[in-house]
């Protein structure tokens, strides 16, 4: 085992102890305005508590073991219609496999989905969705039995995608579970985009979970997919990316699997004791774990602390995965523009990284623009210098 040490190299920059002091959970969870001071909002997430006596229970068979609904979306709809100013909603998921999309609208109160199995994989929400689907295929896949109807709480979300006039639905409509609400919590369950290896290694964005709201918490959750597994994002009601604010998320004691950019988005997200497992089975190129698109004025993007990074046997030889790359979202026509284009921010610290990853050059060229990675190793460096990437490590161990 080898420990990474300051200052590293221009291809693999390492933070000093003093620099690393800034990259802690409280800093990531404190939201500030553009000037760094106004509109300060401090979030202090605690362990997820659930109500086992909740009236909304999802099970494989309605009427058995207290199940009131056969699908997760049915339970979400019923709970939102009957909330009657409840401060929060808990939805219990009995062990089973639930096939179908789950959409949670922006105006939902704090909502918790929790599995009652002994392990997170005892409760599975799954569907095969592909960004390359046509709108017609999307409608057939997501709404073949009228799961979404006008007047339903999340109808607008479905309709934004079902009514698209493009040839394909794109990444923004390819999520199995999609929440636009603040204060979403998920505990002890698994979400799978079941497209997996049924497609080739080209671009097939297939999101398991997408979150747009603020103060998102995942605990003992498994997210499984290939490209774009977890979209931890910030957007508006029209399903558009926004650049004037960001959301926060806390992912703890969880497992995330994928191949290309499989943790990505504009939110400020902390991954605490998360196992990231990179797979080669689809034959994809440009394999990266992270692809943040933090705005240049946002000091904090993604933080992975006390995490594990592993890969499958496809990386045991000369082929290696990358830890991540910046996503220069929105700059395909202009190229990277300092202080305008997103400049993804990420710190991986106090974590273990196995031999599946490129030790010499763990960061790839930016998505969208192919901007070459530029690490700042100057002794007087500004960690937010827009002329450089903001992808860092601290106190990690390279496993043999």
Curated annotation (Swiss-Prot):
Cysteine disulfide partners in this protein: none
One Pfam family this sequence matches: Pectinesterase
Entries under Gene3D superfamilies matching the protein: Single-stranded right-handed beta-helix, Pectin lyase-like (2.160.20.10)
Site note Transition state stabilizer, residues: 227
Residues engaged in binding substrate: 171, 205, 325, 327
Alphabetical UniProt keywords: Aspartyl esterase, Hydrolase
Catalytic residues, chain numbering: 228, 261
Entry keyword Ion transport: no
The keyword Hydrolase belongs to this UniProt entry's keyword annotation: yes
EC number assigned by the record: 3.1.1.11
Annotated transmembrane regions: none
Family of this protein: Belongs to the pectinesterase family.
Name of the protein: Pectinesterase B
